[in-house]
């Protein structure tokens, strides 16, 4: 049942132009989004809207179409090193991990302790325990694993923090919603 809903969502996102690459379609096909949802929302895992995560109610799992919007422009390939700022449920990190493969690296930072614990549990349970999950301030990046080929900031920010720019490989790409809650810059 859920795999059918996942396939329908993928086809919907291909038709809408959100999913552009076969690698993105395959990554999303392999990851059971329902495993990254708060238990009371599992039945809605493939509905195109965000849902609250456990905790203070401020963190959400983004609407499913947002992941290809953020990750497709980064053109992640096998072996890339990726920093995700805002781990949320861990779903985005799992997608990035599928895209960069076992020779790549995904580091995901989460500032909220409850959300961090939820992401760690989800990633471990679904076999993505090789994602480096860090509890801390994402605006500082994670210098211990820098340089990164790509950085994805999942929360709105007034500007891209300088420490993240300094941790970006050259050439590299940053994707971030800069300027306000409805802005996206790449």
Q: What is the predicted function of each stretch?
A:
Residues 1-85, 91-95, 99, 114-125, ...:
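Class I SAM-dependent transferase core
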Residues 75-186:
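Conserved nucleotide-cofactor-binding alpha/beta core module
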């Amino acid at each position: 049942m859920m795999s059918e809903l996942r396939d329908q969502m993928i086809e919907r996102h291909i038709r809408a132009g959100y999913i552009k690459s076969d690698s993105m379609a395959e990554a999303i096909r392999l990851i059971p989004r329902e495993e990254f949802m708060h238990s009371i929302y599992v039945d809605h895992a493939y509905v195109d809207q965000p849902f609250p995560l456990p905790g203070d109610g401020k963190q959400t799992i983004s609407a499913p179409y947002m992941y290809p919007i953020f990750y497709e422009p980064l053109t992640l390939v096998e072996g890339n090193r990726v920093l995700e700022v805002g781990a949320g449920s861990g779903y985005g990190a799992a997608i990035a991990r599928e895209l960069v493969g076992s020779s790549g690296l995904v580091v995901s930072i989460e500032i909220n302790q409850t959300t961090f614990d939820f992401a760690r549990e989800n990633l471990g349970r679904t076999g993505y325990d090789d994602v480096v999950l860090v509890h801390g301030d994402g605006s500082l990046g994670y210098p211990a694993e820098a340089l990164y080929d790509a950085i994805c900031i999942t929360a709105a920010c007034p500007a891209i923090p300088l420490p993240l720019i300094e941790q970006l490989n050259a050439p590299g790409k940053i994707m971030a919603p800069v300027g306000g809650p409805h802005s996206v810059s790449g």
